[in-house]
Every structure is written in C-alpha cells, then in structure tokens.
C-alpha cells in the first residue's frame, strides 16, 4: 500500500501541517482532496491513518489529522493504525558497484522498493563513473524516500557514501558482520560457485551481497572479498546486465529466505 513518509510527529492535537514538496506530493501526485485519507509512516516507525481535513491551494498548505477508531467505551477513541507488511526473514545489505549514467539511480530505487536495509555504493576498478557528484547522495536519499512511499516499504533503507572497495571493507563492512550473516558475490561464471539454496541453507538473519559494475568485479576485488569470507554465487540463467543482476539477486534471496520453511535441501548438501 502506498504511504506518505513524514519527517515530523503530529502535534498534541494530532495534526500535521505540510507545505513545500510534501504539499506537492500529496496534492499533485496523490491528488488528495479534503476528506481523503492515507497511511502515514511516522519518524518512530509507526504507521497511522491520517485524513486531509483542510487544504489551502493558495498557501500551498495541507493539514492532516490522525484518524480514530471507536472503542468499546463510546467516550474513548484510539488512533487508527496501519498493519505493516509481514516482516522479512532476513536483512539484505547490497554492496553495489557504481554503474554509468542513471543506472545506479535505478538500482537504488528498486532496492528501496524491495526492502533492502542498507545500500553500499562501491567505486570499483571497472566502474566507468568514478567521479561522484556532491549532490548525488541527496538525490539517492530522495529516490529512496519516493520509492518507499510508492511501495509502502516499512524498511528505513539507508545508503552510505560511495567509496572504493578497500575503504568499504575497512570501515563499512566490519560493523555489519556477525553471527547469522552470510556474504556472497555474484558471478556470471559457474565454476565452483554455490547455488543460492546452498548459500542460504543456514537460514541467515542477514545477507551481504556484492554486485559488480558493467565489467564485473575485478580479480583484485574478488580476492579481497574472498579473504573477507564472501562466497561466490552463480545464478543458473542468462548473462544479466549489471542493473538487472541487482534486482534479480535481491528478489531471489528474499523469496528463497522468506519461504525457507517450505523447501529443504537434502541432508548431504545442507
């Protein structure tokens, strides 16, 4: 279900007064009218229903008010909350090599829609776009917010500053490792790579996934990842473009992990 992500909590009267980009989104994109309601995700992570009780197009201002539901005691009303989607069985951290043009923007949007927890942009040896625009990070955050509003994702997807793999492995990755974490790097070559089911056989609580750029992951980067415990994963399908591989991999990991209780590897493999 689509949602609006609020940067502020309602006031003591249960209202939010919105202007600027928030007004534009609700009025022009969502086409809200007085009396309409929608789910609002608050800063603390709670999702509530709010209705538009006043719209001033002249001032470009819209006021939302918490909706209530009657309780058994007619003198008491409770805030109408929104049931969140079923929680994912695992967290996904995506180490995504920077791609050329707007392809990285596409991956960021799709990852946020799919509920990836953390996106780590990597400036790889084969990355064509090595110089980063200072405004890029703010654009990424805006893309993530728009994607979460469109998809209704309750996951507060975060994105780190783009950095070379050496810096990522030194500063970003270590705090995210721990028991219940599995790390994999995707490869178009089968070789001795693991199947996805084998990779996820232990039902990990966290998956760290590395996806290369247009030219893949360099030999030096592969060695660095392998030394950190990353296993090579291969999808038994066609050769995928880098921007396709990211969504394909995330979807495969989520589906297999979320449905882990419905399949089982032979004991000799697991």
Predicted regions and their residues:
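RNA substrate-binding interface of SAM-dependent RNA methyltransferases
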Residues: 74-184
């Amino acid at each position: 279900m689509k949602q609006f992500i609020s940067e502020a909590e309602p006031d003591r009267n249960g209202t939010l007064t919105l202007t600027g980009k928030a007004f534009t989104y609700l009025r022009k994109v969502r086409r809200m009218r007085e009396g309409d309601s929608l789910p609002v995700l608050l800063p603390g992570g709670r999702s509530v229903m709010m209705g538009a009780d006043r719209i001033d197009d002249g001032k470009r201002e819209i006021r939302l008010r918490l909706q209530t539901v009657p309780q058994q005691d007619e003198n008491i009303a409770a805030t109408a909350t929104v049931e969140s989607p079923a929680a994912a069985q695992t967290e996904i951290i995506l180490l995504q090599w920077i791609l050329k043009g707007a392809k990285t923007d596409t991956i960021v949007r799709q990852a946020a829609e799919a509920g990836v927890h953390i996106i780590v942009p990597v400036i790889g040896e084969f990355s064509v776009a090595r110089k980063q625009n200072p405004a890029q990070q703010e654009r990424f955050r805006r893309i993530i917010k728009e994607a979460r509003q469109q998809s209704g994702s309750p996951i507060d997807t975060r994105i780190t500053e783009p950095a070379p793999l050496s810096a990522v492995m030194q500063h970003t990755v270590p705090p995210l490792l721990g028991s219940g974490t599995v790390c994999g790097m995707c490869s178009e070559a089968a070789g001795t790579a693991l199947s996805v089911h084998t990779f996820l056989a232990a039902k990990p609580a966290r998956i760290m996934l590395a996806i290369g750029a247009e030219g893949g992951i360099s030999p030096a980067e592969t060695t660095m990842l392998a030394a950190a415990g990353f296993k090579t994963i291969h999808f038994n399908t066609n050769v995928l473009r880098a921007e396709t591989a990211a969504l394909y991999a995330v979807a495969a990991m989520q589906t297999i992990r979320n449905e882990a209780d419905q399949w089982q590897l032979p004991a000799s493999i697991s």
